[in-house]
């Protein structure tokens, strides 16, 4: 086992705080509408230019191991806030720095670290309750657009496109962000349920212009096994032919004689049929077939529930207003499923989302919710260069997370004003002893830090602006973009409550751990091995003339 380098007490805390300051100073330069850019070197290709706090934090590694530990713990604040709320990483870092810096000073002055931590926790708890009281629900598209705009560093086009996407697919819908091919941002919306499987034979195409198979008011057969024998399909085909409607078959595979017969029937115009493979694999395939059954009001023909394909009737089939099948995708529009059953299914999937620990599973489950609840929107980010594209895409993703958080828990006035207003709830608190009360005071000062930093980045005097904001009430604050005072909601400067709350709670959590740290252990630097002695000359070489 390698030897360890151990630091205690003040020496440990001083080094840790130094690391915190290095990381926080780099990150907080990006805060506010007049925040600066940070350039990140890449091992290959052009450097990345960003105003995204968490992107800056993730790149920082310090040479001194003890300083690096401090930096990594603050990086954890940024990452955890980003995971919880999707935004607010810079605010969380600024809060953590303020709490740690003041806390470390108090410990150096001889105060009890545990009492300081209890005081900070007490203050944060009261502030969170006050934030929830200040919070207003987001109901209209305008508020959603404003939240997106602020999170995307005051880029209105991003805020508006996110609001439009949410309006089209609903608040439960899935919105994804991709790199576009043009200069402008674009929005593509797929309504209904779409899955990535196309027709099994090009002979099913009936719309030559779009090279797709379009079915109006079709029946939908869902089967979880292969179909290769046409006899199994005859009862269903006869029922559909009598009804005079088209048929969509979704099965694990349709092959051989069965596929050939379906193609012949389609060409001759006896029954209009399209066959596609079921999406997904294994258990996920079964779940997606069940989703389709719920959406269309049909039943999955499966031996597991005692249903055989040859015994299936027209009553077991689902219905939809329209189905479009291209070479690569199938879209079911306006399924005939019962809305209460669909809602129950969505609720069931949401429970699975809460229970799962896998990010991949969570993403797939959220996609299933979207397909049942509304649809899928794709925001294609446009830019003129690759570097701008990456920076802009990161901002769009931040803004999207922020708007989701706003829909979830509501919004508070932005620009650091909400935390200043929450001071009212904390100002009257007193701890069980003097050290706890000092911990409360540390939290009070830290909650002013985001506003101070926004003002400092805008080139103004933080104390003067802060005092003027404190004199006001409610939404009254400072718009750093144009230097005006007024109602932050009217200015359109809003922060999601969840983002502000998560930033404060996560910063206090890590700060409490760092203040109460008494020893730090790291690998001792390895001493350089002595160089090998120089080898002697080779014998028998004398007399050679060079």
From Swiss-Prot:
GO terms for molecular function: ATP binding; ATP-dependent protein folding chaperone; isomerase activity; unfolded protein binding. InterPro entries: Chaperonin_Cpn60_CS, Cpn60/GroEL, Cpn60/GroEL/TCP-1, GroEL-like_apical_dom_sf, GROEL-like_equatorial_sf, TCP-1-like_intermed_sf. It comes from the Bacteria. Pfam families: Cpn60_TCP1. Keywords: ATP-binding, Chaperone, Cytoplasm, Isomerase, Nucleotide-binding. It catalyses: ATP + H2O + a folded polypeptide = ADP + phosphate + an unfolded polypeptide. ATP binds at residues 30-33, 51, 87-91, 415, 479-481, 495. Residues 534-546 have a biased composition (Gly residues). It is found in: Cytoplasm. Residues 526-546 are annotated as: Disordered. One of its GO terms (cellular component) is cytoplasm. PANTHER family: 60 KDA HEAT SHOCK PROTEIN, MITOCHONDRIAL. Belongs to the chaperonin (HSP60) family. Forms a cylinder of 14 subunits composed of two heptameric rings stacked back-to-back. Interacts with the co-chaperonin GroES. Together with its co-chaperonin GroES, plays an essential role in assisting protein folding. The GroEL-GroES system forms a nano-cage that allows encapsulation of the non-native substrate proteins and provides a physical environment optimized to promote and accelerate protein folding. This is Chaperonin GroEL.
